[in-house]
Amino acid sequence: MLKEITLDIYHLLHPKIAFFLTSADKKGNPNVMTCAWATPVSEEPPLVVVCVAKESYTAELIKQTKEFVINIPTKKLLKALWVCGKTSGRDVDKFKKARLKGIGAIRVKPLVVEGCIGYIECRLWKAVDAGECYAFFGKVLSAYGDDNYIQKGLWTKSAEIPLHLGGSRIVYFK
């Protein structure tokens, strides 16, 4: 029997990859948040979109510096995903709090999270007001991944990428 869903209808579109979204302020100070709302939207030009709460520090930084990185972790970084998802970077260095190491990206100023297995570096193409969120469309400047987990352009079963089901539920891609 089908039942109408009136709250959290977006959960029908889950699971989504849980990832780190990195940004930086104008001085280059790093920030990281946990996110699951992202999708490719165009191959030519290569565009992705991430949706971020308007009041978040990350949204403020992306609007200022116009760059961000999608960092795809494995389950080894699950604790750090939770820390970065429960804390604002406005007053706390989340890299330090989550015990993450940031390393230089190839084409943008925001750092990439060491230990992730995939990275998508983006320059802001367009920001769209989308209810309580901004939808940040990013032009992909560079995308790369760990070849131990990618074969023929696809993730291998051993990647163990966290998938967010909604709420506090996470499963792993296998």
Predicted region positions:
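Basic, polyanion-binding surface patches
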Residues: 1-174
